[in-house]
Design a protein with these regions (language model features):
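Active-site loop of short-chain dehydrogenase/reductase
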Residues: 12, 86-88, 134-148, 180-183, ...
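Alpha-helical segment proximal to the catalytic Tyr-Lys
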Residues: 132, 176-180, 236
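Substrate-binding pocket helix/loop in short-chain dehydrogenase/reductase
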Residues: 100-104, 108-116, 207
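C-terminal substrate-recognition "lid" of short-chain dehydrogenase/reductases
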Residues: 219-245, 250
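Catalytic loop of short-chain dehydrogenase/reductase
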Residues: 142-166, 171-180
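Conserved glycine-rich cofactor-binding loop
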Residues: 20-21
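A short, exposed helix-loop element centered on a Lys and neighboring polar residues
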Residues: 127-128, 172
Length: 260
């Protein structure tokens, strides 16, 4: 399961939020395959159990906790669960489902709050607890946040775009603060990944027109990129950046094809 035939994270521990989602799952499985002792969390109990089984087939069984990061008690419960053995690696992939109907003038307050709380608030406060523990243990830890192209380009998902924009700046703020302690903080902005947070069909998206590489990405494209960013051997001097993994999608503006 290791990409290079070596265990990039042997002897290290990792915490992955949103681990039952498409991308979160791929990252958690890759981390386990690279030798990390993984803790996984998600709001979906059944899918989280499936991920735990998948990881158990390739490495030691993960620790897992069901959590709802849209409220304060959720991230606190996760932290209390791992505080006795804090992770060396933190990946924040949790994100509520988003819908195309959540337009600026129609998105409901509860939906807006759940998005901001899960992506931004929980990402900040849980990440801060993890980072403080890393610094106290003199660990050259890594924090990785799953952001989005919509952090900089609007797409009628105001709560989602705003939360991801906040996460992108949070990466930079954390990186400035934690760099002197040897802790690296980065983000990944995925492109069009079917099976992610909202449905995308090839017929409606026309990837060959909008994606220079001519195909959708997949969860493992993101997971492999995450392994590179998290590896101190390969990316040990990279911090405060957001890596765009989109096959070139950002090279097109959404108005390039106004009929869509």
């Amino acid at each position: 399961m290791s990409i290079l035939g070596i265990k990039l994270f042997k002897g290290e521990s990792a915490l992955v939020t949103g681990a039952a989602s498409n991308i979160g799952r791929a990252i958690a499985v890759r981390l386990a395959g690279e030798g990390a002792d993984v803790t996984i969390t998600d709001i979906d109990k059944n899918r989280l159990s499936e991920v735990a089984d998948e990881i158990s087939n390739i490495s030691q069984p993960p620790r897992s906790i069901v959590s709802d990061l849209s409220n304060t008690s959720g991230w606190k419960n996760v932290w209390n669960f791992v505080a006795d053995a804090p992770p060396d690696i933190f990946v924040h992939s949790a994100c509520p489902q988003r819908h195309e109907k959540d337009l600026p003038l129609s998105v409901e307050e509860g939906t807006f709050d759940a998005m901001i709380n899960t992506n931004l608030r929980s990402g900040f406060f849980l990440g801060r607890e993890v980072a403080n523990a890393m610094r106290n243990r003199n660990v050259e830890g890594r924090l990785l946040y799953l952001t989005s192209l919509h952090a900089t380009e609007p797409r009628n998902l105001p709560h989602y775009s705003a939360s991801k924009a906040g996460m992108t700046m949070m990466v930079k703020e954390f990186a400035r603060e934690l760099g002197p302690s040897g802790i690296r903080v980065n983000g990944i902005a995925p492109g069009a990944i079917p099976g992610g947070g909202f449905a995308t069909s090839e017929d409606s998206f026309r990837p060959k027109r909008k994606i220079p590489m001519g195909r959708f990405g997949n969860a493992d494209d993101i997971a492999r990129s995450a392994m590179a960013l998290l590896s101190n051997d390969f990316m040990g001097y990279v911090t405060g950046t957001t890596l765009i993994v989109d096959g070139g999608l950002q090279l097109f503006n959404w108005i390039d094809f106004p009929e869509q």
